[in-house]
Amino acid sequence: MSQWSLSQLLSSLHEDIQQRLSVVRKTFGHPGTKGDASENVWIDMLDTYLPKRYQAAKAHVVDSLGNFSQQIDVVVFDRQYSPFIFTYENETIIPAESVYAVFEAKQTADAGLVAYAQEKVASVRRLHRTSLPIPHAGGTYPAKPLIPILGGLLTFESEWSPALGPSMDKALNANLTEGRLDIGCVAAHGHFFYDQASGAYSYTNENKPATAFLFKLIAQLQFSGTVPMIDVEAYGQWLTK
């Protein structure tokens, strides 16, 4: 009688992601098409394996003051408590309060891409976010503190050798403020994350990077808790303008 193998199941998850990214790299010649296909691989993985309270999409993020982020390759956002998500001509617009994490997704990591990803992440973190007191039977709970928005980078390969070595560390440490990248994956090599306790990046070279990254992301999202109660009327004021 055959038996299940958890090790094989976890390995298969990574192998599927790596194989799909590899096919994209080899098959599509147009950079734009290749980029879109790479984003779709990561979005599909997150939508499949993250708890259903989360959803992933390529999107812009907007705040109640009318400010927009740059276009973000992969946004992980709340779908359970978000009162509205705009979709117009296949473009998705997500309120800033609903965002848990944002990622830049490309085929290959290099210094330019890391800096570009940091600016993309900063464009989301700079947005204004509201948080309302929460009503209950006996009154109201204080407004929930805003959760940190995770920023990250998702690629198949790296221009550096070693892929997760000093060159990547230098690029990541160039921006540890609004643009800080908290977590990322180079699917052919390993994953990384920013360790708050040590104030430094941790790098892991491994055989199943996509799976390890997914588990680490889920763990970080668990610590994020739930997004705050959005002030819908702050957005509604734009109906009169």
Curated annotation (Swiss-Prot):
What positions does UniProt annotate as the active site of this protein? D73, E104, K106
NAD recorded as keyword: no
Residues reported in the UniProt entry to bind Mg(2+): D73, E104
Instruction: Please give the cofactor(s) recorded in the UniProt entry for this protein.
Output: Mg(2+)
Site residues, Binds cAAA: R53, Y81, T226
A Pfam family reported for this protein in Swiss-Prot or TrEMBL: DUF6602
Q: What is this protein called?
A: Endodeoxyribonuclease NucC
Q: Which gene encodes it?
A: nucC
